[in-house]
Amino acid sequence: MSQNLILVLNCGSSSIKFSVIDPKTEKKYISGIAECLKLKESSVKWKIDKSYHESSLNEYSDHNLALRFIVNEILQHKKDILKKIVGIGHRIVNGGIKCTKSTIIDEKILKNIKDSIPFAPLHNPAHLIGIYESFKIFPNLINKNVAVFDTAFHQTIPEDSYLYAIPYYFYKKYNIRRYGAHGISHSYVSKKASNILNIPIEKSNLITCHLGNGGSVSAILNGKCIDTSMGLTPLEGIVMGTRCGDIDPSIIFYLHEKLKISVKEIREIFSEKSGLLGLTNISSDFRYIEDNFLKNKIAKRAMKIYCNRLSKYIGAYITLLENKLDGIVFTGGIGENAYNMRELLINKLKILGFEINKEKNFKIRLGRSGIITNSNSIPALVIPTNEELVIAKESIIFT
């Protein structure tokens, strides 16, 4: 076992994903998730080597209690691992315009994360809890906490893509612009894709699709991101599990002025009650759509809307890549596993030079990676993401 391990924390609005990784060998010694935080059924699931465990937390446990459980009830029982943790890597969804690369967390970085809360209102507050609790639990590592920003990969986006067509004053005064998200994942799979395609990353033109409960698409020109579908917040873009993605802004005025729905309620509707959940009124889980779209008209409608929006982004982004597209990449829980969705989507892209290989498309899921199109097609690849490994590799640099 290496003497230098990294504890990776991804604190979400109601969950904490955690892992202990050796950045050099890429081995994951511990991984798990505390979920349903602040609810009655809060629990922790984790894996050590090949052994799986699960435990209930106290009812309505918050992030602080969950982190204490992770350290006291999991890591403390693996002291050979605990004593070799030399740094803590934190995934940060939005670092604003000032945080352009991974960095040690100090007061200045903490202020930037706080100032960016309006742009990631569900995520950044949770990240701060994770950081401050890490300071308390690991006082010996207080100067070894590293922020790895989802927005950093998107800092290469030019202003003709990140500016909105609203008065320029709002950007200059309040930094209202496109920030994007999932940058850690987009960066990882773009490099993996360039290796598979045997093209240097600095010459790779790709469209990467991170498709999970949240989802985003990025256009990558010569290895650099030049546009992405998420915007000021993670609400913009494609259809997601509970988020609406792109809509006519006038819907907000109609709901508020005509239907007398408060701004707070509208925010909740767009963030937590829309997307696949809103379209089906049953589930935000894409597995329901995959399993039922051939026999259920509601699921079929949701699938078609999802693929229509996604295909529009892919088609539009191809025009930004200077007449050369090396491939598109699917990642995230949906992108890696939803073979029916991938087939429907790629069939929509036939006009652009894509041709699905049904056998490969069916086989390449459940953690497998590879090309799912025919040899005469522009490649479409499935690549499982590994954000935790990226965070660990970025963090070890500062230890």
From Swiss-Prot:
The active site is at D150. Its main location: cytoplasm. ATP binds at K17, H210, L211, G212, N213, G214, D285, F286, R287, G333, I334, G335, E336, N337. HAMAP family: Acetate_kinase. The keyword Iron does not apply. Keywords: ATP-binding, Cytoplasm, Kinase, Magnesium, Metal-binding, Nucleotide-binding, Transferase. Homodimer. The lineage of its organism: Bacteria, Pseudomonadati, Pseudomonadota, Gammaproteobacteria, Enterobacterales. The keyword Transcription does not apply. Belongs to the acetokinase family. It comes from the Bacteria. Substrate binds at R91. Pathway: Metabolic intermediate biosynthesis; acetyl-CoA biosynthesis; acetyl-CoA from acetate: step 1/2. PROSITE patterns: ACETATE_KINASE_1 (PS01075), ACETATE_KINASE_2 (PS01076). This is Acetate kinase. Mg(2+) binds at N10, E387. It comes from Wigglesworthia glossinidia brevipalpis. GO terms for biological process: acetate metabolic process; acetyl-CoA biosynthetic process. Its cofactor is Mg(2+); Mn(2+). Mg(2+). Can also accept Mn(2+). It is found in: Cytoplasm. The gene is ackA.
